């Protein structure tokens, strides 16, 4: 009635509700709505540091079923969502991301007091450093191209966390589109032929990322000497495609 064509809802999966996403997905298809998924994470801003999927087999099994359903759909968006959900399985298993995190370059987060962070998933036990505060600069470009912002981007490149959230996954899925596409094409064909989708051999794509990123070490992030290069902004304020 309001003329909104792209509308939907999502489900953040924890230990107790993974089975719900299967019927919620089916309901979304019946209603002609979009359906998105996430898995719970820890963050200073989420006020949580003990979120952990403990019944991994059950949760991964339900994500597997969802992936197979998504690949049966006629929409390419659903096929790429299947890839995104494979990334959630990979995250739950505690592995480094399939594609690198480029938070602080492809996206950013402004907290209520004006500090700009690369994302909202930072934790003190790993690292948490601001790129600057919007109240202390005359323009956003001054902050975005500052040495402090570049320093934080360096910390992102060696960040121990293996988060897989839409805000940081979607931009790199688009940037390195050939890698998700290769998985999508292969597994869409398997789905059309009635073959099972394998989730045990999760691809990890080397696009030049630092091997330290996402290794879940709970220690100080190593500081590397960096050369500051001027760059064009690649800012994504919101992401609704997944």
Enumerate the language-model features and the residues they cover.
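Membrane-interface junctions of multi-pass transporters
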Residues: 122-170
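Radical SAM enzyme [4Fe-4S]-AdoMet core and its adjacent flexible, acidic
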Residues: 1-117, 121-132, 172, 176, ...
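Short cysteine/histidine-rich metal-coordination sites, predominantly Zn2+-binding motifs
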Residues: 176-187
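Hydrophobic alpha-helical context, especially transmembrane and signal-peptide helices
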Residues: 19, 137-138, 194-199
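Residues that form generic nucleotide/phosphate-binding pockets
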Residues: 62-69, 142-143, 155, 162, ...
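Short Fe-S-cluster ligation motifs
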Residues: 151-160, 188-218
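Alpha-helix boundary/capping detector
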Residues: 54, 185, 189-190
């Amino acid at each position: 009635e309001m003329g909104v064509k792209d509308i939907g809802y999502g489900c953040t999966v924890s230990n107790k509700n993974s089975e719900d996403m299967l019927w919620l997905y089916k309901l979304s298809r019946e209603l002609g709505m979009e359906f998105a998924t996430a898995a719970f994470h820890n963050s200073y801003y989420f006020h949580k540091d003990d979120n952990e999927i403990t019944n991994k087999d059950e949760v991964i099994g339900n994500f597997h079923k969802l992936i197979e359903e998504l690949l049966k759909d006629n929409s390419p968006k659903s096929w790429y969502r299947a890839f995104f959900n494979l990334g959630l399985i990979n995250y739950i298993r505690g592995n480094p991301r399939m594609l690198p995190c480029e938070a602080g370059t492809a996206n950013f987060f402004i907290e209520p007091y004006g500090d700009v962070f690369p994302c909202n998933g930072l934790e003190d036990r790993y690292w948490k450093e601001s790129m600057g505060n919007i109240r202390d600069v005359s323009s956003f470009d001054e902050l975005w191209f500052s040495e402090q912002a570049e320093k934080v981007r360096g910390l992102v490149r060696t960040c121990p966390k293996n988060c897989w959230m839409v805000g940081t996954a979607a931009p790199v899925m688009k940037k390195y589109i050939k890698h998700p596409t290769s998985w999508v094409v292969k597994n869409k064909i398997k789905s059309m032929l009635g073959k099972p989708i394998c989730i045990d051999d999760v691809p990890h794509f080397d696009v030049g990322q630092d091997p330290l990123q996402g290794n879940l070490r709970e220690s100080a992030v190593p500081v590397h000497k960096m050369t500051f290069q001027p760059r064009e902004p690649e800012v994504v304020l919101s992401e609704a495609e997944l």
